[in-house]
Amino acid sequence: MIQIPSDLNPGLVPLAFLLGTWEGAGVFDFPGEEKCNFGQEVVFSHDGRDFLEYTSHTWVLDSEGKKVRPLESESGYWRIDKDRKVEVVMVRDQGVVEVWYGELADQKPQIDLSLIHI
């Protein structure tokens, strides 16, 4: 069950399912880059204003799943309007700024986003 904090801005209730700390692991495999295992931690938080704060950190993992070194980090803000349109503005540690727009699906926790600006 999703818990909605009492101090969450009412306009952000549709995004409440994102709040908290999320962790996972995968394989980093991009052309021109060294393939490696990685771990990721994503945190969505709020302070009562009309946006969610987002941070993400990834690390290279060894064969036992232990952190070897930082891989990438990014941070930004998520907003939603009354028509369920979502805007994400984030900056990556390489100095790249991304703006994503999309829509929150009806009746399920799914957001479809498209990159608009880099």
PLM features per residue range, with description:
Residues 35-39, 70:
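Amphipathic hydrophobic-ligand
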Residues 63-102:
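Helix-adjacent hinge/juxtasegments
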Residues 44-50, 79-84, 102-110:
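A short, structured loop/turn motif at beta-sheet edges
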Residues 39-61:
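N-terminal glycine/threonine-rich, aromatic-flanked beta-hairpin/loop signature
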Residues 28-34, 62-66:
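Flexible, membrane-facing loop/turn or short amphipathic-helix motifs
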Residues 116-118:
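Conserved small/polar residues in nucleotide/adenosyl-binding loops
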Residues 7-21:
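N-terminal helix-cap/turn-to-beta initiation motif at the start of protein domains
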Residues 24, 52-56, 86-90, 110-114:
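Short hydrophobic/aromatic-rich beta-strand segments that constitute the beta-sheet cores
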